[in-house]
């Protein structure tokens, strides 16, 4: 829904640079979607290094990266159609709720959602499977048909792990092969 690649890449580059790595030598495209700690753990050996990189990323994302987002074409019209149909809509993102909420507000999408589901800052919920599981605890979903829509493999795997049907979209960052 949200084209966040410019801000995400900017923040990965910032964090890698602060940690002494050359960001131009790192393909960050595979880190669009997965949890931050997992992404940084691919490059740093210790938990302390991973946590420091996450901190650099988050500070820069809050100040700069979160404002470098835009909507993919057609998203607002799609959201209008879904809302007009009376569908319950929730997010299930690996971004922390505290991070995604201001982005949704800035992009004018916040009011479309009945529930903002996201990761927690303290790591207690930090992967797609757990985020979806948390969203599914909403009593308003009891007895409802649910469809997980996503653009990355972890979206599809999170749906499978929660025994949900899923629809892959290609307007985001995943490829047909990845799905």
Predicted regions and their residues:
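Conserved H-loop
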Residues: 22, 110-114, 142
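Structural signature of beta-strand start/N-cap positions in the alpha/beta core
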Residues: 80-81, 85-88, 145, 165
């Amino acid at each position: 829904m949200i084209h966040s690649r410019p801000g995400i890449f900017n923040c990965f580059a910032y964090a890698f640079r602060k940690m002494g790595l050359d960001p131009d030598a790192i393909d960050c495209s595979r880190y669009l979607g997965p949890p931050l700690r997992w992404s940084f753990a691919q490059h740093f050996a210790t938990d302390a290094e991973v946590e420091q990189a996450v901190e650099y990323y988050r500070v820069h994302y809050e100040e700069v990266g979160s404002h470098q987002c835009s909507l993919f074409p057609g998203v607002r019209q799609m959201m209008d159609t879904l809302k007009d149909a009376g569908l319950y809509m929730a997010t299930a993102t690996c971004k922390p709720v505290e991070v995604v909420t201001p982005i949704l507000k800035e992009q004018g999408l916040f009011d479309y959602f009945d529930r903002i589901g996201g990761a927690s800052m303290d790591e207690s919920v930090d992967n797609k499977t757990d985020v979806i599981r948390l969203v599914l605890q909403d009593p308003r979903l009891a007895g409802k048909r649910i469809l997980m829509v996503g653009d990355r493999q972890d979206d599809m795997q999170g749906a499978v792990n929660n025994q949900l049907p899923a629809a892959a979209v290609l307007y985001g960052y995943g490829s047909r092969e990845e799905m």
